[in-house]
Amino acid sequence: KLRNFVQNISSKNNFKHIVNIGIGGSDLGPLMVNKALKSFYKVPDILYVSNIDPTKISEIFIKCNPKETLFIVTSKSFSTLETLENAKIVAEWLSKHKVALNDSMVAVTSLRKKALDWGFNDSNIFEISENVGGRYSLWSSVGMSIFIGLGEDNYKKFLLGARTMDEHFINEEVENNIPIILALLRIWNRNFLNRNNHCIVPYTDNLSKLPAWAQQLEMESNGKSVDINGATLKMPASPIIWGEVGTNAQHSFFQFLHQGLEVSPIDILVPRKPLSLIYFKGSEKNHEYLLINAIAQAEALATGSVDLINQNKNFLGGRPSTIISWEENTPFSIGMLIALYENITIASGFLWNINSFDQWGVELGKTIANKISNDKNDKDLTPAAKNFLNQR
């Protein structure tokens, strides 16, 4: 069904803009891939709306023609407040411009009936399994914007890259199994060396969104305090994941990485070649600078430097980094890289004996917000929260 829909869109070429409305796993994954593989995208413009802040949706309305824009409403539960509120605003905007909802909006959800009740035709609803967590869902219909953008041939290569890494994870012996080795390193740093954070620095601007995606992947999966049996963990699980694109990060927080008292294990991600699709005179030289900087930072973190006269110039070294490298940014290689990080998270969770596929920690805040919004009742709130609400 998804394939036929995407083929139909591509053949008719009616839409100049594709807008994905979703949050969390319904946004971060597709957005990250869009940025990573933009050079391969066939659709002129794919945009993403996640926050309920009206600023973003207003920008969409200014930029887009309602008759030439497809909106993908992505919510597994079809009850996500931010997503549905943005979808309501879009539906009103389309109606104002005499555009029928089902001509310009589709729904991606695991609860088909809710989407039907909302007003979507059955042909405009694309279901995902209720068992697939949002942060692992970009391979499903949640990745519709990826499929539309890449086109069928490149989308298949993207999926094949992920499958290749998954099969490596499942079949390879432990001593040569890349996700398991990196998961063991993560646990070694987290639990034995007490390093509570892990930095990811991609030396390619295409992967500037990967640290934020990896942050959700690891911290929502493994940010737990009890194991699968409900017993309190004896050691902490997920490290804090953070990062930024290199070389920008070198002029930002690398001072902390090199000389701060807190040691941060770091993944340095770098393709060995510039993307052949965007070759221009000087591109190879610029890319060589990226490679050199990536290697130099890993070397400096490892070896350090001693200045006996000026202690401010001392670099202690012994700071762990892992260089993860591939040929160039293609649908296949990016698919492999994404699956690599997924499998690191899964393997780590297995070794910590926790459930990496639930996320109850996100529910309490939503429950309280819904209670305040629906019941207008603040009697159970703290004095500070009541005071803040009364200032509205």
Listing of model-derived features with the role each one plays in the protein:
Residues K1-K12, S283-T303, W326, S348, ...:
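Extended, charge-enriched "interface" segments that sit outside catalytic cores
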Residues K1-I9, V33-N34, S39-L70:
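Glycine-rich oxoanion-binding loops at beta->alpha junctions
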Residues H17-I21, L70, V106, C199:
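Conserved beta-strand elements of the Class I
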Residues H258-L261, V270-T330, I334:
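Substrate-recognition/cap regions that form aromatic- and gly/pro-loop-enriched pockets
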Residues K1-K16, I60-T69, L185-N196, L257-E262:
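Glycine-rich phosphate/diphosphate-binding loops that line cofactor/substrate pockets in enzymes
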Residues L28-V43, K63-N65, K88-S95, G119-I125:
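A glycine- and small-aliphatic-rich helix-loop capping segment at beta-alpha/alpha-beta transitions
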Residues G29, I57, V73-K76, T80-L94, ...:
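Extended, hydrophobic alpha-helical segments in both membrane/secreted and soluble proteins
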Residues W93-I278, G317, L364-N370, N377-R392:
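Active-site phosphate/pyrophosphate-binding segments
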